[in-house]
């Protein structure tokens, strides 16, 4: 066993990893990326052993992907099938039709063209029958889609005469006789009709007809011979047939039809009505004959390939009529066809039949001529063929459907054919009515006939369906087959059908009914088909879900995955679907009710409440059992039974959680081999390891599947529920166990299919699993909505995976399932299991079952997470009624209590159990009351979901017990309005945490685990210590509850009520004060700074400082104790008792927070606040509960430990654990007194070291003791390394230590990176978390992505410098055209690389040299550019200096990419040479150019001289320069002066004027 287990576990782990990896990669395939598709194809090939799971993933992705992203997934499927094949080909073939239709329906026309091209490449890959079925289905959606006929060797409808028809023929004779006479009469008219049709069709088929002429002539001769023989036979059999005819109408019961259908049907048609009708109207007969031919099953055979798909939609409507008519017509046609056939052949009526068909005709005609009766079947076939030929008109209709003819016919003949058809229809309808009257019985017979003859040949699928289906199913199949066979039967019908088809079909598409008729019927008929075909419908639903989900989803990522999964949308969809075609759904074998609504997973869950479970289709039921086998427990079957029973508070040290089972077993074997451990020890350790991992695996599975269950849904199933949670490192919900999930998926589909789907939840209805395996934080994965809350994490579990599992239907929300917090079992982390119905709306409260775990039994309607109630929020809402809106986590009370406090009844009251959300009082504070064992002194203090749930950290603390401090999440106030508890902290897990924000509704409403919890988990240290979760400071989770509370600590602020209280705790440095937000005091709010339970309390701020002792004590053991204590944990002990109303103190859940100001700590003096509880200092012992003495006292609180959280309090002392007090609120309920712990025990709690908790559990149960024992053994033998020193306390708090261990473990993991340098394929294929973690740890270079550990900061700095140099060089070099030496020396090559070594770097001057060169070049360029330039004006413009009038030189500026004027500047729109402008400025400063305003009369020269004099006086430039300027260009100056003078004059004139 021990050896197999590891192997099996390894295989399961490999499967999960493979599926998880593939799923994540597949989700990135959002567009047609060939490299990505190639990569996924290679990955699929590498994971060939998991082909089924991967195929399920791909099909699920196809279903849930947006319409724009479906085609790439189809290309991926195509790539895998063509390049890998093998198992993948088989797996994809199974659901090929459903998958293809699912995509085809949702995409636009362009994508459909791509799909057609894709389909055209599959002829050599997929089975032809499968492709034919696919074509038929698609054709029913899009009549333009060609149906590729099956080759003769594959096609069931071969030309041979069907022996069944031959058997029938003897009965048919009478009709033939009559028919014969009528045919002669009708033949002439038929010919003209045929000719007309031919003229229409000939345009399209002239070439074909020419080729067929010879064949037709030969066939004619054969037919003539056959006709003679047939006449002789008919004469012989006429008497017999007549007798049968007489009997036929009345005597042919539908029952007979089923067995004898062929014969009876044939007889019937020929018998009574046929003759009279024929005799009555030759022309009408002709029409009928033509029509009949189309309807004739035999004709269909020939044309079935082409027209199959198209006709199907129409068939339904016309099935009855067509069948009757076809039967009648066939009889008529037989004789008429014979005559016509010869004429037609002669006239070469362009039978659309190809040579192949012609041959068929020949054989048929032969059979016809041979004997109308026996051959009649044959004849009917031949007739059909002939009629097809003769009825080229009809054929044209058919041809439209027939891919071969379609091309030509569609454009040219369609309009004509339509008109003709219309006319024929009217005539046919009349005839039909007549025939119907006479052949109602026949109709049935004909149907069966068709089924036997045509259907068999035409559609293997139909046959299978018939075989599989019961009579009801059969009727539906018949209808289908009929509709198929009628393809060619009635052109008239066809055209109308076609039209109807489109609109109705579309309608159907949009509605589930559509599925119901086709997919539904098929499913009904056969489960196997249902699996295949049902898939598509689910996929559609999933898509719809996606859409709606997208809107709902809070987290984009989750939206993406979860929503699609989400059943919610299904609700809407259901309504649409159900509205669409209830009839069709009814056909489904499931109860019509369930059938009508194609329920999405969660809806189904709801229906479960109604008892739909009973109506679940077998496969659903099967699925449930299946899922349970996976380890998902159904809500009813406690997980403990499935797996080991586990302590509710079970906490698994992080080292164990992170350790690889394989590695542990390997190392253990090595120790055994080296003699370090004995064989007995080896066996014990291996057994314990196996149990531990089995438990963890089970929890994961449970989480997943339940989770999925809830939403039955497809999506979820397909998807991992994990995905969403990938967030927390650990969180990763169950890790998804994708495989599991996938498997489930497969099972699920049927659900989708079946109307029965109803019970969606496979598992129980949804179980909520708070799995979080490792993660601490619980994450509510749920599809969330539907309420399922999944605490992934053990929630509390910090370390441990202890997942909490809300097993309940959870998803159900309303579902009748109870929610089950499985609790301990939860892995180590003790998951909480709400067993109760949880979602149920009323039904069944939840039950926290875990043994250890608490079982909230309460009637309460279960808590509803989010539930339908849905408060979206997400919080978890124990809604109780479900209905309750309230939200907060409200354990609603049995139902309703609005407040709904919920009562967790602990079934056993056991202490543990204790938590009972009584709900009753709900009202009052609505607090939840943990009735719990109530008395238990610490009794678990209320529910504290500490244990399991919160489990300390995470847990929510129900105040009562949860009083625990922080620890649990306390749903304390949950009612409080504030109420929401927000586990901010840990849970947050780091961010992951669950945030029960939602339900919350309550304002605070849900609890939100906001904090990141550093450790990832929350670390409520205090409360549970839980392993850790320690509210350690920030980490800790902060129950923000109120949300307001900022402090990390968990502040149960919001919870109000609970957290209302803030244990500020004086205790430590600061008094603890429960500050109620509301002032009410009542609520204690652990505000305080929230002290962090960091230090031993100290931390004054630490808000629960002590309470949990947190700090101080870390409840190390809590973890271990954890839930257990839960029950009792001291303080909370009573929680149960506590009504949780408010915590005792007033913590009522009122929201008010009571402020326990009391510095003293724990005494919560605070007003008792409304809460009933008085908390009055509970601690004070005052009332409140008292900590179980035992606990209390024990200083250890150890027991408290049990309490876990409260215990944490270890430090309590001072703080006294306010928590206890506070939490205690419960107490009063219990009546237990709160013994205040008083600091006196402050530390006490702490103790309980890990061990304590366990209290004795059954042997089969995986208790904390077992885990601790195993952990200590592994540490002792060196198999596991402690991430941090394991002091006694540490051991006690293994779980507690977990948070820090997480960090240490990360380091250890890095150190434990396996040596893969031997490159062994098997090893490289394994997933090593340590390797992956290594890839994501350290400082990452923003430029190249390299990572540097914290010890490599210097190297990182040098690395950044190197990037800078490289970037600078590249930038500089890019400015100039550069060259390189012909030969690069080794040093040059090396210099291109980053060199960290200082000495080497000193030698690496390559870039510096290049830089210098670049600098020189740029400097030269700068010199060249020292001249100023301005953009040139428009091309062709002559631009010159305003001063010297010299034309500027133009050049092309590379940087600006435009022509510039060299050595120029532009000033006020004028361009100058810089030197000219400089001179101009200098002179202008002297007013060298008199301004017009001055109108000087003096000679400009004098003016200039004066200026120069002035300039000389002012130390300016030397007079020489000035003189030079003036003298050098005297003429110029004079001219310039003159000009100005003139200007002045003018100006003067102007002015004077």
UniProtKB/Swiss-Prot annotation:
Gene designation per UniProt: Pcf11
Post-translational modification: Phosphorylation at Ser-120 and/or Thr-121 by WNK1 weakens its association with POLR2A/RNA polymerase II, promoting transcript release from the chromatin template and mRNA export to the cytoplasm.
Modified residues (Phosphoserine): 120, 169, 182, 490, 495, 510, 512, 645, 705, 777, 794, 851
Organism: Mus musculus (Mouse)
Subunit-level organization: Associates with the phosphorylated CTD domain of POLR2A /RNA polymerase II.
Gene Ontology CC terms: mitochondrion; mRNA cleavage factor complex; nucleoplasm; nucleus
Protein task: Component of pre-mRNA cleavage complex II, which promotes transcription termination by RNA polymerase II.
Regions of compositional bias (Polar residues) in chain numbering: 321-342
One BP annotation, GO: mRNA 3'-end processing
Modified residues annotated as Asymmetric dimethylarginine in this record: 805, 820, 833, 929, 944, 957, 982, 995, 1008, 1092, 1103
SMART domains: RPR (SM00582)
Coiled-coil regions listed: 208-235
CDD domains given in the database record: CID_Pcf11 (cd16982)
CID domain span: 14-142
Ranges of Low complexity composition bias in the record: 174-186
Ranges of compositional bias, category Acidic residues: 1301-1313
GO MF: mRNA binding; RNA polymerase II complex binding
Protein name listed in UniProt: Pre-mRNA cleavage complex 2 protein Pcf11
Subcellular location: Nucleus
InterPro entries: CID_dom, ENTH_VHS, PCF11-like, Pcf11_C, PCF11_charged, Pcf11_CID, Pcf11_Clp1-ID, PCF11_helical
């Amino acid at each position: 066993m021990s050896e197999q287990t590891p192997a099996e576990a390894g295989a399961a782990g490999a499967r999960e990893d493979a599926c998880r990896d593939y799923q994540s990669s597949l989700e990135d395939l959002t567009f047609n990326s060939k490299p990505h598709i190639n990569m996924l194809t290679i990955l699929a090939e590498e994971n060939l052993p998991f082909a089924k799971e991967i195929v399920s993933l791909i099909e699920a992705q196809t279903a849930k992907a947006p319409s724009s992203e479906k085609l790439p997934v189809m290309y991926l499927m195509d790539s895998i099938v063509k390049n890998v094949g093998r198992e993948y080909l088989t797996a994809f073939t199974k659901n090929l039709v459903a998958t293809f239709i699912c995509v085809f329906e949702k995409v636009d026309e362009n994508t459909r063209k791509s799909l057609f091209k894709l389909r055209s490449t599959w002829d050599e890959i997929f089975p032809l029958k499968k492709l034919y079925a696919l074509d038929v289905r698609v054709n029913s959606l899009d009549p333009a889609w060609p149906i590729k006929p099956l080759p003769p060797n594959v096609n069931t409808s071969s030309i041979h005469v069907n022996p069944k028809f031959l058997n029938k023929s003897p009965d048919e004779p009478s009709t033939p006789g009559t028919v014969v006479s009528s045919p002669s009469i009708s033949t002439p008219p038929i010919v003209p009709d045929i000719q007309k049709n031919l003229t229409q069709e000939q345009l399209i088929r002239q070439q074909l007809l020419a080729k067929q002429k010879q064949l037709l002539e030969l066939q004619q001769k054969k037919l003539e011979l056959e006709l003679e023989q047939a006449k002789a036979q008919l004469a012989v059999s006429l008497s017999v047939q007549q007798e049968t005819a007489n009997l036929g109408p009345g005597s042919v019961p539908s029952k007979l039809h089923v067995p004898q259908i062929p014969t009876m049907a044939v007889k019937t048609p020929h018998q009574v009505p046929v003759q009279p009708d024929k005799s009555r109207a030759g022309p009408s007969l002709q029409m009928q004959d033509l029509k009949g031919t189309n309807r004739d099953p035999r004709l269909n055979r020939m044309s079935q390939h082409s027209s199959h798909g198209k006709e199907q939609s129409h068939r339904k409507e016309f099935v009855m009529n067509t069948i009757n008519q076809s039967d009648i017509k066939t009889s008529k046609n037989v004789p008429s066809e014979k005559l016509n056939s010869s004429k037609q052949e002669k006239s070469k009526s362009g039978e659309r039949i190809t040579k192949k068909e012609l041959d068929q005709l020949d054989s048929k005609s032969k059979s016809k001529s041979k004997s109308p009766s026996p051959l009649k079947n044959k004849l009917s076939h031949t007739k059909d063929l002939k009629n097809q030929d003769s009825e080229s008109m009809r054929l044209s209709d058919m041809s439209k459907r027939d891919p071969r003819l379609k091309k030509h016919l569609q454009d040219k003949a369609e309009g004509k054919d339509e008109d003709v058809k219309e006319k024929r229809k009217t005539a046919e309808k009349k005839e039909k009515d007549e025939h119907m009257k006479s052949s109602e019985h026949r109709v049935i017979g004909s149907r069966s006939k068709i089924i036997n003859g045509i259907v068999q040949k035409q559609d293997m699928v139909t046959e299978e369906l018939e075989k599989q289906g019961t009579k009801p199913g059969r009727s539906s199949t018949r209808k289908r087959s009929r509709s198929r066979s009628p393809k060619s039967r009635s052109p008239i019908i066809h055209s109308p059908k076609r039209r109807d088809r489109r609109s109705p079909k579309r309608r159907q598409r949009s509605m589930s009914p559509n599925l119901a008729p086709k997919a539904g019927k098929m499913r009904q008929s056969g489960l196997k088909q249902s699996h295949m075909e049902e898939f598509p419908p689910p996929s559609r639903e999933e898509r719809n879900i996606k859409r709606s989900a997208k809107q709902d989803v809070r987290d984009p990522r989750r939206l993406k995955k979860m929503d699609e999964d989400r059943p919610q949308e299904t609700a809407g969809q259901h309504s649409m679907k159900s509205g669409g075609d209830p009839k069709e759904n009814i056909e489904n074998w499931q109860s019509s009710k369930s059938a009508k609504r194609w329920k999405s997973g969660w809806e189904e869950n709801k229906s479960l409440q109604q008892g739909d479970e009973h109506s679940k289709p077998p496969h659903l039921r099967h699925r449930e059992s299946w899922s349970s086998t996976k380890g998902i427990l159904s809500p009813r079957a406690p997980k403990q039974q499935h797996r080991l029973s586990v302590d509710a508070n079970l906490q698994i040290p992080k080292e164990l959680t992170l350790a690889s089972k394989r590695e542990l077993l390997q190392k253990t074997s090595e120790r055994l081999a080296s003699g370090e451990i004995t064989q007995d020890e080896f066996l014990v350790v291996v057994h314990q390891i196996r149990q531990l991992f089995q438990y963890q695996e089970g929890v994961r599975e449970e989480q997943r599947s339940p989770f999925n269950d809830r939403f039955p849904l497809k999506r979820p199933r397909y998807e991992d529920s994990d995905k969403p949670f990938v967030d927390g490192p650990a969180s990763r919900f169950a890790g998804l166990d994708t495989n599991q999930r996938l498997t489930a998926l497969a099972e699920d589909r049927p659900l989708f299919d079946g109307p029965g789907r109803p019970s969606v939840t496979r598992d129980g209805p949804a179980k909520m699993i708070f799995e979080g395996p490792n993660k601490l934080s619980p994450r509510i994965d749920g599809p969330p909505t539907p309420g399922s809350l999944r605490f992934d994490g053990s929630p509390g579990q910090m370390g441990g995976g202890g997942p909490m599992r809300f097993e309940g239907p959870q998803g159900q929300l309303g579902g009748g399932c109870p929610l089950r917090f499985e609790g301990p079992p939860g892995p180590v982390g003790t998951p909480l299991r709400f067993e109760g119905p949880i979602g149920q709306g009323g039904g069944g409260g939840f039950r926290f079952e875990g043994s250890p775990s608490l079982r909230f039994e309460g009637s309460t309607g279960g808590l509803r997470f989010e539930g339908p109630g849905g408060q979206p929020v997400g919080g978890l809402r124990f809604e109780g009624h479900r209905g309750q809106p309230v939200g907060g986590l409200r354990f609603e009370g049995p139902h309703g209590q609005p407040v709904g406090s919920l009562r967790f009844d602990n079934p056993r009251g056991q202490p543990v159990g204790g938590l009972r959300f009584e709900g009753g009082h709900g009202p009052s504070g609505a607090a939840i009351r943990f009735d719990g064992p109530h008395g238990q002194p610490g009794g678990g203090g209320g529910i504290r979901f500490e244990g399991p749930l919160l489990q300390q950290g995470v847990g929510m603390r129900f105040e009562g017990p949860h009083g625990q401090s922080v620890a649990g999440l306390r749903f304390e106030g949950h009612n409080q309005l504030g109420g929401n508890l927000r586990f901010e902290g840990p849970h947050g897990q780091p961010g992951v945490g669950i945030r029960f924000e939602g339900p919350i509704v309550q304002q605070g409403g849900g609890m939100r685990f906001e904090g990141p919890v550093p450790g990832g988990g929350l670390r409520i240290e205090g409360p549970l210590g839980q392993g850790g979760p320690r509210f350690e400071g920030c980490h800790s989770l902060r129950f923000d509850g109120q949300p307001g509370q900022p402090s990390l600590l968990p502040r149960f602020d919001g919870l109000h009520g609970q957290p209302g209280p803030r244990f500020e705790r004086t205790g430590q440095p600061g008094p603890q004060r429960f500050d109620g937000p509301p002032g009410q005091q009542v609520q204690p709010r652990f505000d305080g700074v929230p002290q962090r339970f960091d230090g031993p309390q100290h931390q004054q701020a630490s808000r629960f400082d002590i309470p949990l002792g947190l700090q101080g004590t870390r409840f190390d053991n809590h973890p271990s104790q954890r839930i257990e204590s839960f029950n009792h944990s001291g303080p909370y002990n009573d929680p149960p008792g506590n009504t949780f109303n408010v915590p005792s103190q007033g913590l009522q859940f009122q929201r008010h927070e009571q402020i326990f100001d009391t510095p003293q700590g724990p005494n919560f003096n605070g007003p008792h606040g409304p809460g009933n509880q008085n908390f009055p200092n509970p601690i004070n012992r005052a009332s409140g509960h008292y900590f179980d003495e035992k606990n209390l006292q024990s200083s250890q609180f150890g027991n408290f430990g049990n309490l876990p959280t409260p215990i944490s309090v270890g430090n309590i002392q001072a703080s006294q654990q306010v928590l206890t007090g506070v939490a205690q609120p419960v107490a009063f309920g219990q009546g237990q007194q709160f013994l205040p712990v008083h600091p006196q025990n402050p530390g006490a709690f702490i103790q309980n070291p890990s061990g304590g908790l366990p209290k004795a559990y059954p042997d089969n149960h995986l208790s904390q003791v077992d885990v601790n024992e195993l952990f200590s053994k592994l540490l002792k033998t060196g198999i596991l390394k402690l991430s941090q020193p394991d002091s006694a306390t540490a051991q006690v708090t293994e779980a507690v230590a977990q948070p820090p261990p997480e960090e240490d473990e990360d380091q250890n993991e890095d150190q434990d990176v396996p040596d893969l340098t031997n490159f062994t394929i098997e090893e490289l294929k394994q997933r090593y978390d340590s390797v992956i973690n290594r890839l994501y740890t350290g400082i990452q270079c923003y430029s190249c992505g390299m990572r540097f550990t914290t010890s490599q900061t210097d190297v990182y700095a040098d690395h950044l410098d190197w990037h800078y140099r490289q970037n600078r060089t590249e930038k500089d070099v890019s400015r100039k055209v550069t060259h390189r030496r012909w030969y690069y020396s080794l040093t040059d090559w090396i210099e291109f690389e980053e060199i960290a070594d200082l000495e080497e770097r000193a030698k690496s001057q390559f870039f510096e040299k290049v830089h210098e060169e670049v600098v020189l070049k740029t400097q030269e360029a700068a010199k060249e550019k020292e001249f100023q330039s301005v953009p040139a004006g428009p091309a062709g413009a002559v631009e010159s200096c305003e001063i010297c009038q010299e034309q500027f030189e133009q050049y092309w500026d590379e940087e600006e990419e435009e022509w510039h004027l060299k050595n120029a500047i532009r000033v006020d729109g004028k361009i100058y040479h810089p030197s000219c402008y400089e001179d101009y400025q200098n002179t202008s400063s002297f007013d060298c150019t008199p301004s017009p305003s001055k109108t000087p009369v003096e000679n400009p020269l004098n003016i200039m001289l004066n200026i120069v004099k002035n300039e000389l006086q002012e130390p300016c430039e030397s007079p020489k320069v000035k003189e030079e300027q003036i003298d050098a260009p005297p003429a110029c100056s004079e001219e310039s002066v003159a000009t100005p003078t003139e200007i002045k004059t003018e100006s003067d004139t102007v002015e004077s004027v």
